[in-house]
Amino acid sequence: MGLWNGKGTGGFILYLLVAFSVAVFSVSYVGDTTNPIHHHLSSLSATEKIWPDLKFSWKLVLATVIAFLGSACGTVGGVGGGGIFVPMLTLILGFDTKSAAAISKCMIMGASASSVWYNVRVRHPTKEVPILDYDLALLFQPMLLLGITVGVSLSVVFPYWLITVLIIILFVGTSSRSFFKGIEMWKEETLLKNEMAQQRANMVNSRGELLIDTEYEPLYPREEKSELEIIRSNLKWKGLLILVTVWLTFLLIQIVKNEIKVCSTIYWILFIVQFPVALAVFGFEASKLYTANKKRLNSGNTECICEATIEWTPLSLIFCGLCGLIGGIVGGLLGSGGGFVLGPLLLEIGVIPQVASATATFVMMFSSSLSVVEFYLLKRFPIPYAMYLISVSILAGFWGQSFIRKLVAILRRASIIVFVLSGVICASALTMGVIGIEKSIKMIHNHEFMGFLGFCSSQ
């Protein structure tokens, strides 16, 4: 039940801390050997918008196929797919990096929105509760939104090679962790299926067979419900209202901040205001979970407070808040929705794959749409291309959820979702890694500045 109940989690966190620390501290050495003036001149040309025309070609066909598969697999795993979209948009279609990140957010928004619409029409696989965990959404969403704003700011300060290294470190770690989690689940499912087969053989035509089948049935409804009844049961208006309010608050701050001179006093005030807003909502939900968990322990109740199976102690709550913040920062640096951290984290705290996928895409819908509105106001992406790729992502997100649910129902192995999640993160690590290394090598050959940049001077 505890978050630190195994060596795996502690070892994974230690790996991230050591690797991140080495990478960040190495900037001071690398930065001393390069020329900041040369970098400033080259960065000016790198910021030029490159928007290819939307016309039929083999590149568009290939990009459409990759976008469809990336969106389908990304929503199934609850990670979005930004690590696949950005390289596809830059290498195949020829967009500049900033425009690619903006269009990537549009695609994630479309895929996650269609995925959420599909999921609200699906019942929870084992309980009579919403498949979207609103408690976890309220816990992670404000920190994720805060992290995205911080990540966007850090993307201006951090050198490109450092962002590449940090992303590879994180993606390799989360992908490996998720893969081993999937193997564990696969073994457990195999044991359960073998036990069921053995008990069926011993209890043919008996009442016990029905009881066993009912106990294992995580994928079929216990009683018939209409689609409207399922939608109503999956929508909690109070939780939705809070989530939308937080989203609107951050959106308003971003809109006002974009109209103000960078690094002015008002700019920094608005930037700092985001912290108490996010921490207030996070603190409200954290105290709610902590109090409920304490009452549960005092009463001797063994039922979990929400979908997570961990004990909601101050340490675990702080850990989840930091992970949400890190997920947002990664989303801001990479141009993804933050699901590369949130998806694996939900599995780590004991959320079953179906609910983890649904909840992660639900939270990503808010984070990605916030960025899309901001990018639209900044005119960061061409509308025709964005609308086309959003349409592809919407179809892919819906199809991906439908296909994987049927596959899981047939095979009775929810671990498939975990393997898809791991595969998408691994593919993202490879594509982002190759592109990042190639670009970093070019920067070294051109003797460009490889250290930290000034935030105000780089705007």
From Swiss-Prot:
Q: Which organism is it from?
A: Arabidopsis thaliana (Mouse-ear cress)
- Which residue spans traverse the membrane? 10-30, 50-70, 75-95, 99-120, 131-151, 152-172, 240-260, 266-286, 315-335, 338-358, 381-401, 416-436
Keyword Transmembrane in the entry? The reply is yes
Q: What is this protein called?
A: Sulfite exporter TauE/SafE family protein 4
Keyword line = Membrane, Transmembrane, Transmembrane helix, Transport
Cysteines engaged in disulfide bonds, as pairs? none
Per the similarity annotation, which family is this?
Belongs to the 4-toluene sulfonate uptake permease (TSUP) (TC 2.A.102) family.
Q: Which InterPro entries does the record match to this protein?
A: TM_pro_TauE-like
Q: Name one GO cellular component term.
A: membrane
Keyword set includes Transport: yes
Q: How does it sit in the membrane?
A: Multi-pass membrane protein
Q: What is its main location?
A: membrane
Places the protein is found: Membrane
